[in-house]
């Protein structure tokens, strides 16, 4: 049978106290809406309709081209939100999943199981439920002695007996598509909130003697709906625990998983060692046998095999096999480090390519530069790439030796096998195989220091 899906993403999320629509708040690197959308895709829906409202344009940008959108200009309840999908889905045959866009922990496996349960039991409606240790505040699932679902009762309306029920409504449902939109025509706003509730559809089906079932989640965490920053932090914690467990099962070692922060789309090869307080974000990929030490922060970068990154930051860059970075190095966007490069402590590389086996051991800035293989940068080397208005490029050939405390003022080119003397300021091209000396001549004035206040004889 054919599956369809409706994702409810129109709400403002007042309790988030944010200008950002609630469903766009991120969990492990992507928005809650994207998490839900990915899980929904596990049921292979022929059509997915996302209901948007508050700051609809922002929400639409996140899933542009991946779903159909309908607008809920007034937020009049969950039932009203589902009504907005009627022009797209009402005449179709199959079953429709209805899910909130603020449930980032739901898994595709659970949604597939829910759909299968719905079909196998020939239900008109199936409620996704969970067993809560503390069900206070949730709608309870009331069953008869045969285990059949009778109704959903909200906390404020529950009797003392019903309040003891631990099975709760998660707010996710599967409906026979045609019957869903027929029943929606019969719900009203005769309730304390003055809204159209999707749960009223369940009551209509029961009154008609139609079969309503409930499928219970194995993991209560999946039921979490995020309404405030506290729940958002809970979702973040659960998601990161899942992510880290997945990587450990796949052969990655963590010194302290609870203090390691890895986004959902990060890829890590086996035999990688990850120490505490490491953060890996975005589309980062880490090659096999790499070591990431305490304090390393990597964003949208590709790291090769057998690299060692020590307490350093790498952003939007590529690092080849066998490279060592840090401690306290900063590889800024647009940089590439070739095989066996060494970038040491307090070195910054920005928008530059560095050739194989090149070494910048300490206290160096390499910006907007193209650096060949086997180059050595002495401590304190600075490529001066900005004149206050425009940035310029430095080109350094292979096998170049740059002495300590040298300043290379772009645009300039250092030819292959050249040498720059320590303390030089280079403003002109240096030919291949040449030595460049660009510093003032040293002058010694004999006994002159005796005239100065610091000298012992003057104290």
Swiss-Prot record:
Tell me the pathway. Nucleotide-sugar biosynthesis; UDP-N-acetyl-alpha-D-glucosamine biosynthesis; N-acetyl-alpha-D-glucosamine 1-phosphate from alpha-D-glucosamine 6-phosphate (route II): step 2/2; Nucleotide-sugar biosynthesis; UDP-N-acetyl-alpha-D-glucosamine biosynthesis; UDP-N-acetyl-alpha-D-glucosamine from N-acetyl-alpha-D-glucosamine 1-phosphate: step 1/1; Bacterial outer membrane biogenesis; LPS lipid A biosynthesis
Q: Cofactor note from UniProt?
A: Binds 1 Mg(2+) ion per subunit.
- Residues noted as binding UDP-N-acetyl-alpha-D-glucosamine in the record, renumbered to the chain: 8-11, 22, 72, 77-78, 139, 154, 169, 227, 332, 350, 365, 376
Q: Which InterPro entries does the UniProt record give?
A: Bifunctional_GlmU (IPR005882), GlmU-like (IPR050065), GlmU_C_LbH (IPR038009), Hexapep (IPR001451), Hexapep_transf_CS (IPR018357), NTP_transferase_dom (IPR005835), Nucleotide-diphossugar_trans (IPR029044), Trimer_LpxA-like_sf (IPR011004)
Which controlled-vocabulary keywords does the entry list? Acyltransferase, Cell shape, Cell wall biogenesis/degradation, Cytoplasm, Magnesium, Metal-binding, Multifunctional enzyme, Nucleotidyltransferase, Peptidoglycan synthesis, Repeat, Transferase
Q: Which GO terms describe its molecular function?
A: glucosamine-1-phosphate N-acetyltransferase activity; magnesium ion binding; UDP-N-acetylglucosamine diphosphorylase activity
| PROSITE patterns linked to this entry | HEXAPEP_TRANSFERASES
Where acetyl-CoA binds, per the record, is at 379, 385-386, 404, 422, 439
One cellular component term (GO) for this entry is: membrane
- Matches recorded under Pfam families: Hexapep_2, NTP_transferase
List of catalytic residues: 362
Q: Which metal ions or organic cofactors does this protein require, according to UniProt?
A: Mg(2+)
Task: Name the Enzyme Commission number(s) assigned to this protein.
Answer: 2.7.7.23, 2.3.1.157
Where is the protein found, in the record's own terms? Cytoplasm
CDD domains, alphabetically? Answer: GT2_GlmU_N_bac (cd02540), LbH_GlmU_C (cd03353)
Q: How does it assemble?
A: Homotrimer.
Query: Which family does the record claim for this protein?
Result: In the N-terminal section; belongs to the N-acetylglucosamine-1-phosphate uridyltransferase family. In the C-terminal section; belongs to the transferase hexapeptide repeat family.
Q: What is this protein called?
A: Bifunctional protein GlmU
The organism encoding this protein is: Streptococcus gordonii (strain Challis / ATCC 35105 / BCRC 15272 / CH1 / DL1 / V288)
């Amino acid at each position: 049978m054919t599956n369809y899906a409706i994702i409810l993403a129109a709400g403002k999320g007042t309790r988030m106290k944010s200008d950002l629509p609630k469903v766009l708040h991120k969990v492990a690197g992507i928005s809650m809406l994207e998490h839900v959308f990915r899980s929904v895709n596990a049921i292979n829906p022929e059509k997915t309709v996302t209901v948007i409202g508050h700051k609809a344009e922002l929400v639409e940008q996140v899933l542009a081209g991946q779903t159909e959108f309908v607008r809920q200009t007034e937020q009049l309840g969950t039932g009203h939100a589902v009504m907005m999908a009627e022009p797209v889905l009402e005449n179709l045959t199959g079953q429709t999943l209805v899910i909130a866009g603020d449930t980032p922990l739901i898994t595709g496996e659970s949604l597939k199981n829910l759909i299968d349960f719905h079909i196998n039991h020939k239900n008109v409606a199936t409620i996704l439920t969970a067993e809560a240790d503390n069900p206070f505040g949730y709608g309870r699932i009331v069953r008869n002695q045969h285990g059949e679902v009778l109704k959903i009762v909200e906390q404020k309306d529950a009797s003392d007996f019903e309040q003891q029920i631990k099975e709760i409504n998660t707010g996710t449902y599967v409906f026979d598509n045609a019957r869903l939109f027929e029943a929606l025509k019969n719900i009203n706003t005769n309730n304390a909130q003055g809204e159209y509730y999707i749960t009223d559809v369940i009551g209509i089906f029961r009154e008609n003697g139609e079969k309503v079932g409930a499928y219970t989640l194995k993991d209560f965490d999946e039921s979490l709906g995020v309404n405030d920053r506290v729940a958002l932090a809970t979702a973040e914690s659960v998601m990161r625990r899942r992510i880290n467990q997945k990587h450990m099962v796949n052969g990655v070692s963590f010194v302290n998983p609870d203090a390691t922060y890895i986004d959902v789309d990060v890829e890590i090869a086996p035999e990688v060692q990850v120490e505490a307080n490491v953060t890996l974000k975005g589309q980062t990929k880490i090659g096999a046998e790499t070591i990431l030490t305490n304090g390393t922060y990597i964003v949208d970068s590709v790291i090769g095999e057998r690299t060692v990154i020590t307490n350093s930051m790498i952003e939007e860059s590529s690092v080849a096999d066998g490279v060592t970075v840090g401690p306290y190095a900063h590889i800024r966007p647009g940089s590439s480090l070739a095989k066996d490069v060494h970038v040491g402590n307090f070195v910054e590389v920005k928008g530059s390519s560095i050739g194989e086996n090149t070494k910048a051991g300490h206290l160096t800035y390499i910006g907007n530069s193209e650096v060949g293989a086997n180059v050595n940068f002495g401590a304190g080397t600075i490529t001066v790439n900005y004149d206050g208005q425009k940035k310029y490029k430095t080109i350094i050939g292979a096998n170049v030796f740059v002495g300590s405390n040298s300043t290379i003022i772009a645009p300039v080119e250092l030819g292959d096998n050249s040498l720059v003397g320590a303390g030089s300021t280079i403003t002109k091209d240096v030919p291949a195989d040449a030595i460049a000396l660009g510093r003032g001549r040293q002058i010694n004035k004999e006994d002159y220091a005796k005239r100065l206040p610091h000298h012992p004889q003057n104290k």
